[in-house]
Amino acid sequence: MRSTIFITLITLFFITACAPVMQNKKIQDGALNSTSSNTPNNAIDNKSAQKETYDAHRAYTRYHFEDEEMDFAFQWLLGSISTGGAEIGEAFYVAGNIEDGSPVSWQTEWEKMAIRKEIRAKEALKNGNNITARESYLKASNYYRTALVSMMPDNPKFNGIGKKIRTCMVEAGKLFNPPMTYFEVPFEDVVLPGYYRPVKKDGQPRKTLLMIGGGETFIEDNVFYIEQQTIKYGYNFITVDIPGQGMLPAQGLFFRKDTETQIKAILDVILSFKEVDPEKLAVYGISNGGYFVPRAATVEKRIKALIVSSAVVDNYLMFKEMPFAKDTQEQIDKWPAFKKAVTSAVTWRWGLDPEDVKGQVEQTKGYTFDPAKITCPVLDIVGAGEYVNKETERQQKEFLDNLGTQNKTIVITPENEGASSHCIGENRTLMSEVLFDWLDGIFKEE
């Protein structure tokens, strides 16, 4: 049995109960059903397209740009306003100066704003204005990161901007109370970068969330995705890049099937932190983290709760449903420049020539896991827009029906609360409410 939650007009309904303590539970919520009749036509068209061809960057509300790929990237940036990653005036000022659909214009304008914020941060720090310095460093890091979204790895600026993302975040982390510290996980002959921020630096073990990103994330993205909410809910926050993520591909570290070996190395390190309670360690994976983390959980029983947004049981079958798999090379060559740039940048993370975007399909063969080997409690969060895709829905069903635990829940977040896109990046508050309310219940049970 599994618990299914649809956020609707009156309540959150548990369609079927997964554990006795969760039976008949109802949570008051003002959300609207995602099939509202006043949905814009472009959203309806996108939902219809999503049913047949899965596109992670398909949006259901247009925020500013006509170029859909660019508008999705802008949407992701806007989602970080609530977590300190951007200011609405700055974001729309930059957007107003970008040539719609141009990767170069996008890079140039976001880098300009990042430089302004970094200068402001340094001045504030020099003058002892630590709060201003921290907030400015955070935004500088995120604006540098946003500039990199459409930049190819062979661009002379690529590595330099990558370093700026890290430097600004490290400086911001020093100014938190308690600080968010940068640390490294030894793995084979390299190190995996991470951030750690405890609720309090007092040596007392507490609930902890380890966040693992997806197919195109940096640990800095994960900070803006959920760090602030994690601390607010009383959990320590940790995030680490695994091979393929962040700047690791520039060192020759591309995605690998065996994420259990990478996450084992991470757990070996973080479980030595005094503030981490080994009995209350949850791990959250978004996007292709919905493969990376569950794969590890089939082996790693030190993971006490698992959250995904959403599950990817078989990468190959999912990638076969994506636009680059279904389009001919001739069609791909005619893609809008921004879409081609973003897709090529992700292709590089798989260890392929960036131009070989179709090669990603074959590259993902064997990226699978057995849900039956996962025995900890599981939460699966899916945006309504993604869930309409047949393969996405099928993989969620395969995942949940075959888990080795009866404590399993799926939540479908709604379009008309601005929570329907990939990883619910546009409504991180709602995503966090769902996650931590569930997780509080799990750890309370114990």
Residue positions per predicted region:
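Serine-hydrolase catalytic core
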Residues: W348-P414
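Hydrolase active-site cap/lid region
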Residues: T298-D356, C376, K390-E391
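Catalytic histidine-centered segment of alpha/beta-hydrolase-like enzymes
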Residues: N416-R428
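Short beta-strand element of the alpha/beta-hydrolase
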Residues: P205-G214
